[in-house]
Amino acid sequence: MAVYNYDVVVLGSGPAGEGAAMNAAKAGRKVAMVDSRRQVGGNCTHLGTIPSKALRHSVRQIMQFNTNPMFRAIGEPRWFSFPDVLKSAEKVISKQVASRTGYYARNRVDVFFGTGSFADEQTVEVVCPNGVVEKLVAKHIIIATGSRPYRPADIDFHHPRVYDSDTILSLSHTPRKLIVYGAGVIGCEYASIFSGLGVLVELVDNRGQLLSFLDSEISQALSYHFSNNNITVRHNEEYERVEGLDNGVVLHLKSGKKIKADALLWCNGRTGNTDRLGLENIGIKVNSRGQIEVDQAYRTSVPNIYGAGDVIGWPSLASAAHDQGRSAAGSIVDNGSWRFVDDVPTGIYTIPEISSIGKNEQELTQAKVPYEVGKAFFKSMARAQIAGEPQGMLKILFHRETLEILGVHCFGYQASEIVHIGQAIMNQPGEQNNLKYFVNTTFNYPTMAEAYRVAAYDGLNRLF
């Protein structure tokens, strides 16, 4: 058994692990990275964020070709299979792996492929694919092993018609009808993707409203758009059992209803990848979801061991995970890079997409904050008309008296890009966070960013 000594060992090469390893390496620390897959990138690159967003992009292109009258001069609408669309995602994954492999090499981060587990508080044993065991001894260890779909024990996920958000990427056919169980972010995104391919989608929601953490107007807009695009949403429903058939699946609900489809996609909950880490050897406990508790410095109950990303829970976003990993390493190297990551924009890649940051109307009303609303509807925006993307709106919530921006909510074309302008102004100190910035600043024309100016004028016109 070979023994290696490091300043920092990072478990997991997803966004959190990458952020941690790069920050520690650039601070001059000797760093090792351990990943159970034989390629870097983690679930984000191989099973989650990257493939699903690449799929979404391809599906949007197909939808534009099939619905834009201009393209009828080229040919009639075309049908594309899910495996065909998946090929574009596979190319993106390969490019991402190559890029990230280069990052680790340039920054002298040693990468070990294999299953890592704790022997003690400073030792990680890595069982490599060839059976060889490597021992890594480190002053500090960062757990960034991510999460995986939660699988109830009473559902047979080995059945060829039952999938979760990881295994759906191995789907070898295009179902005519698909049940998506769980209407969280992942469920809504995949419902959009399959609907765009012409699949009839039954979206089963445990709650009474889609994505209830969103501003209610944005949530309602998504529901309306789903209803117009072959997605049937069933609220306040829970599964009783899943019956696998030779040619499909039947979902039995506790309400007594039954839904039959060609396949079932389970998108209800995730659990932290902690069960194979040997945490019992170092006294770290996990919650019912397999997640690790950390403090604001991202330190666990063991002083030299840190956690970041999905494995610690909220907000379980790739963007936040990278910053959490970087901050965890910042707590170790003390280079001024630590911050508690809480100003996180939400990006939901449905079709159309959604993004928001700050408070929503429900929260401001409950807190009795005197706010006003400014809106810009994309159907009136020149850039949206040019792009053929008239659906959606930008909504700014601001304080009636100080004009401080309290929240930005966007539904539609380029929403996840547009939100960052509002985020930048919201993060300005004191009076610099002001709605008037948008009416006193010249925007390129025509752009989607111009929606901020339109929404600001709309909001100011409401004041008296």
UniProtKB/Swiss-Prot annotation:
Keywords, alphabetical: Cytoplasm, FAD, Flavoprotein, NAD, NADP, Oxidoreductase
GO BP terms in the entry: 2-oxoglutarate metabolic process; NADP metabolic process
EC number from the UniProt entry: 1.6.1.1
Cofactor(s) listed: FAD
Secretion signal span: none
Entry keyword annotation includes NADP: yes
InterPro entries found in the cross-reference section: Class-I_Pyr_Nuc-Dis_Oxidored (IPR050151), FAD/NAD-bd_sf (IPR036188), FAD/NAD-binding_dom (IPR023753), FAD/NAD-linked_Rdtase_dimer_sf (IPR016156), Pyr_nuc-diS_OxRdtase (IPR001100), Pyr_nucl-diS_OxRdtase_dimer (IPR004099), STH_gammaproteobact (IPR022962)
Catalytic activity field: NAD(+) + NADPH = NADH + NADP(+)
Broad class of enzyme this protein falls into: oxidoreductase
Keyword NADP set for record: yes
Family: Belongs to the class-I pyridine nucleotide-disulfide oxidoreductase family.
Role noted for this protein: Conversion of NADPH, generated by peripheral catabolic pathways, to NADH, which can enter the respiratory chain for energy generation.
Protein name: Soluble pyridine nucleotide transhydrogenase
